[in-house]
Regions:
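Phosphate/NTP-binding elements of NTP-utilizing enzymes
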Residues: 2-235
Length: 235
């Protein structure tokens, strides 16, 4: 009959605990809260016991969120100045949708991969609960430090959450890059800088909102950039 030391039993117990995933309990949920800098200086709070992630919002952001929730909304736009939290809103909205719909696919778009890496994607990673989630180096995958992420494949630009939903990290520099794929929703950041191909991109993305769970909505976050394709579409 085998016997185990107290240390061996403790090690086995810790191993079982470490292998217990959040997916074995309840899928994490996101709640919208009102800004409370003294309580949540980062504008977000993660409660691991309840699996609830709270994102703070201000009035204009809440109006944009309400627009995305309206029935038959194809496109919602949040137009605001620099430092207004528009990219924060887009990232948080996308994460909420991705957690709400299991085994689905969502798309986060930046101007191009180089610009998005240091802005759109970085902000998206920073909105994940956990420590140092926004840091990505040759030897460190920050998003994988989040309790709601199971994998970040930087080669394929793919973030997989604990509910098996994938967030595809995309680029708008070629309008037909994602033809043939399916998405439950799309967040397009800095749309005002996409150029005249935005009309073709919009038509293509609209045809891709099918086949998987999601609100079937596109959220544009942008700063005004004159009378261009984005202006025409929003008007």
């Amino acid at each position: 009959m085998s016997s185990f030391t107290e240390r061996e039993i403790q090690n086995q117990f810790e191993e079982v605990i470490s292998q217990t995933s959040v997916t074995e309990t309840e899928t994490p949920a996101i709640e919208w809260g009102e800004a409370n800098p003294s309580k949540r200086p980062d504008g977000m709070d993660w409660d691991p016991e309840s699996n609830i992630l709270t994102y703070d919002t201000w009035e204009a952001q809440r109006r944009a969120i309400e627009t995305t929730n309206q029935e038959h909304t194809d496109i919602a736009a949040f137009l605001a100045g620099y430092g207004s939290g528009k990219t924060l809103l887009g990232a948080r909205w996308l994460i909420k949708q991705a957690l709400q719909y299991d085994s689905s696919r969502f798309l986060a778009l930046g101007i191009d991969f180089q610009k998005a890496r240091d802005t759109t994607f970085r902000v998206l990673f920073e909105q994940l609960p956990g420590d140092r989630t926004g840091i990505v180096t040759s030897s460190y995958n920050g998003p994988e430090e989040s309790p709601i992420v199971v994998d970040y494949n930087r080669k394929d630009h793919r973030l997989t959450l604990v509910n098996d939903t994938v967030i595809k990290l995309g680029s708008a520099d070629r309008w037909n890059r994602y033809a043939g794929d399916s998405y439950g929703g799309v967040w397009a950041d800095e749309v005002g800088h996409y150029g005249d191909d935005l009309h073709d991109l919009l038509e293509m993305l609209g045809s891709r909102l099918r086949g998987v769970g999601g609100p079937q909505t596109q959220l544009f976050t942008l700063t005004g950039n004159g009378k261009n394709a984005a202006f025409d579409i929003i008007e």
